[in-house]
Regions:
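C-terminal output helix
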Residues: 96-98, 112, 116-125
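Active-site beta3 strand of CheY-like receiver
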Residues: 56-62
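Non-catalytic signal-transmission and effector/linker regions of two-component phosphorelay proteins
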Residues: 1-17, 23, 30, 144
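Helix-turn-helix DNA-binding segment
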Residues: 143-179
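Receiver (REC) domain active-site loop signature in two-component systems and cognate sites
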Residues: 65-67
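Acidic catalytic/metal-coordinating carboxylates
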Residues: 44-45, 71-75
Length: 179
């Protein structure tokens, strides 16, 4: 297992997991992504990635389809079984249409053939990390709202229900004997 990471203020931008059995591809992607201030974690196999994957990270996965051991499609299946919220960009030197269709139907966001256009990959990574950050903020707001609602007394919940139903303050006060 080979794991490299570059930690700094890049954590706020998000993490790019790169899983590929080809050293040259991993190094090339690390160079490209770190030059654009991303935190990059490199893995040489699906198994090593699965062992270290942090489901709480704001991240995107750049994943080779064909690797010895666990294939990229098997990694995707494993992540789906864990209900991981992780955008996957597949890269491959030997892809075919049925393979791409299968990956995309299972939720992959892109399927790119090697050699790939660096600008296109970088743009897709940026787009997916932005979406991941937005989803995280939305989920955090929803959790906060649910926690606040759970703290309401039964009477406060009834008042809130009437407000949501469009009742006027005066109508709510009359019904609840609220002054």
């Amino acid at each position: 297992m080979t794991v490299f990471s570059n930690t700094s203020t890049q954590d706020t931008k998000g993490t790019v997991y790169v899983v590929d059995d080809d050293d040259a591809i991993r190094d090339s992607l690390r160079w490209l992504l770190e030059a654009n201030d991303y935190k990059v974690e490199l893995y040489d196999s699906g198994e090593s990635f699965i062992a270290k994957y942090d489901p709480n990270a704001i991240a995107v996965l750049v994943l080779d389809v064909r690797m010895p051991g666990m294939s990229g499609l098997e990694v995707q299946e494993h992540l789906l079984a864990r209900k991981a919220d992780l955008p996957i960009i597949f890269i491959t030197g030997h892809g075919d249409v049925p393979m791409a269709v299968r990956a995309l139907k299972k939720g992959a966001v892109d399927f790119i053939e090697k050699p790939f256009q660096q600008a296109a990959l970088k743009a897709q990574v940026e787009h997916m990390l932005n979406e991941a950050r937005e989803r995280r903020m939305k989920n955090e707001r929803q959790s906060l709202n649910e926690a606040l609602l759970a703290k309401l007394t039964p009477r406060e919940q009834q008042v809130l229900e009437r407000i949501v139903a469009g009742r006027l303050n005066k109508q709510i006060a009359d019904r609840k004997s609220v002054v």
